[in-house]
């Protein structure tokens, strides 16, 4: 897995279309007092050709040193579907919001936006990889 540095967040977010993606697998581990969250997403890569829609890819994210998280399922929302995904870096921690909502143009999400989410995680390190399709 590749480490995602805070300076690469914007570039990484442009690689994939997270809107309408799906959470396929979610694992929260606690080993030796260190929390780790592993999540596998089904997302579309950003389009390069205007005429063709690229097939979805599996994207695995791993957050180590988890400090805080919340995953709450509301009865009126579809299970596993993401409205959008946002990544932020605040006070030395990476935050991922799995049900991000749209902000006004030009507004940058703050830490309070991540903590207000029904599905978020905050931790020390963030790793990612594209999972190869089974053949």
Predicted regions and their residues:
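Surface-exposed, interaction-prone regions used to assemble/regulate multi-protein complexes
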Residues: 1-135
């Amino acid at each position: 897995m590749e480490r995602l540095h805070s300076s690469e967040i914007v570039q990484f977010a442009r690689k994939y279309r997270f809107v309408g993606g799906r959470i396929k697998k979610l694992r929260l581990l606690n080993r030796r007092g260190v929390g780790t969250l592993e999540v596998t997403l089904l997302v579309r890569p950003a389009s390069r050709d205007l005429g063709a829609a690229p097939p979805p890819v599996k994207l695995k994210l791993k957050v180590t040193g988890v400090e805080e998280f919340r995953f709450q399922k509301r009865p009126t929302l579809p299970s596993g579907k993401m409205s959008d995904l946002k990544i932020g870096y605040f006070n030395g921690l990476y935050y991922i919001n799995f049900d991000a909502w749209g902000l006004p143009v030009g507004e940058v999400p703050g830490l309070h936006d991540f903590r207000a989410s029904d599905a978020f995680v905050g931790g020390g390190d963030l790793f990612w990889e594209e999972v190869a399709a089974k053949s």
